[in-house]
């Protein structure tokens, strides 16, 4: 049972998730600090009160704190959106930059040499591997 737990706990996905949770918590503290100590005082100056979040209330309902939480959430959500978008862009570039396997390069060179020797390029020769594209569940 311990061995199974160890295999589960040390899989790459679980460790990545743990790191993401810790980084997310730290990032959330930074954004909360930015909103509380920089953005909200600036908004408070615009509306004429120094402490916008705590002074805006009606019959005990502190909607100023709610507005602060909404602004905090929007900034965190937007920053995470940008981070995920950047990560997806980098992942796509890595996928595109992958070099073809050696056997693919060799087969392409052989095809090109055969085409040069024959002197003609037909549709059948350019698609020579389409019928055998999935031999033994391996892509050529």
UniProtKB/Swiss-Prot annotation:
This protein's UniProt keywords? Cell membrane, Ion channel, Ion transport, Membrane, Transmembrane, Transmembrane helix, Transport
- What InterPro entries has UniProt attached to this entry? Mechanosensitive_channel_CS, MS_channel, MSC/AndL, MscL_channel
Task: Please tell me whether the keyword Ion transport is annotated for this protein.
Answer: yes
Q: Where in the cell is it found?
A: Cell membrane
Q: Which residues cross the membrane?
A: 7-27, 30-50, 64-84
The membrane-topology field of this record reads: Multi-pass membrane protein
**What is an example of a GO molecular function annotated in this UniProt entry?**
mechanosensitive monoatomic ion channel activity
Example GO CC term: the record gives: plasma membrane
Main localization, broad class: membrane
* Keyword Ion transport in record: yes
Similarity comment text for this entry:
Belongs to the MscL family.
**How does this protein assemble?**
Homopentamer.
What's the stated role of this polypeptide? Channel that opens in response to stretch forces in the membrane lipid bilayer. May participate in the regulation of osmotic pressure changes within the cell.
Q: What is this protein called?
A: Large-conductance mechanosensitive channel
Organism expressing this protein natively: Staphylococcus carnosus (strain TM300)
């Amino acid at each position: 049972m311990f061995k199974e737990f160890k295999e589960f706990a040390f899989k790459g996905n679980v460790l990545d998730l743990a790191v993401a949770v810790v980084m997310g918590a730290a990032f959330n503290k930074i954004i909360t600090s930015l909103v509380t100590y920089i953005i909200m005082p600036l908004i408070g100056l615009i509306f004429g009160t120094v402490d916008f979040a705590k002074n805006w209330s009606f019959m005990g309902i502190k909607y100023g704190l709610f507005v602060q939480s909404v602004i905090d959430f929007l900034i965190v959500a937007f920053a995470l959106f940008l981070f995920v978008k950047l990560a997806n862009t980098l992942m796509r570039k890595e996928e595109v930059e992958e070099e073809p396997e050696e056997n693919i390069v060799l087969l392409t060179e052989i095809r090109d040499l055969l085409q040069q020797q024959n002197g003609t390029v037909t549709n059948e020769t350019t698609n020579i591997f389409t019928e055998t594209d999935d031999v033994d569940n391996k892509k050529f």
